[in-house]
Amino acid sequence: MKKTKINIEYPLNTKSNKLIWTLISTAEGLQKWIADYVKEEDGRFVFTRGEAWTENHSLTAKILHREPMRSVKLRWENEECDEAYIELSIAKSDITGQQTLSITDYAEEGDEDNLRDLWEGDLERLHHSSGL
């Protein structure tokens, strides 16, 4: 199935690469803003939304690449589109020195707005949990 590439850039209220790197590349960091529970095992992240004692849903993403202090690239294990991936990367403005979180993801045709809304909710949780 053909998917559309989505790019989102989110300015962050920090100049600390280390803080952002922890939030995008570790289970503990991702758990603060993407899912209720995240664990890393065997080169994969398992993302769970919902509580263990109630209804919950888990998805597993293989870690394709990590460039320390720069980016992490993931691919959902159930992904049918060969070119689809998720990439979270850190960029720095040459002018302001401000850090930006860049997100690349892929949406099914007609589902682009829903995917953007999902990421906007995640980014709002990132802001509330970390102040960024």
PLM regions and their residue ranges:
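Hydrophobic ligand-binding cavity/cleft-lining segments
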Residues: 1-39
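Short, surface-exposed coil-to-beta transition loops
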Residues: 5-7, 56-60, 82-87
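Short, charged helix-to-loop "capping" segments that act as catalytic/coupling loops
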Residues: 8-19, 42, 52-56, 95-97
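Generic structural detector for well-ordered beta-strands
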Residues: 9-13, 62, 89
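A short, structured loop/turn motif at beta-sheet edges
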Residues: 17, 64-69, 90-98
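Hydrophobic pocket/interface hotspot
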Residues: 19-21, 30, 45, 63, ...
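Glycine-rich portal/gate segments that line the openings of hydrophobic small-molecule binding cavities
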Residues: 31-78
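Beta-strand/loop substructures that line and gate deep hydrophobic ligand-binding cavities in soluble
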Residues: 75-128, 132
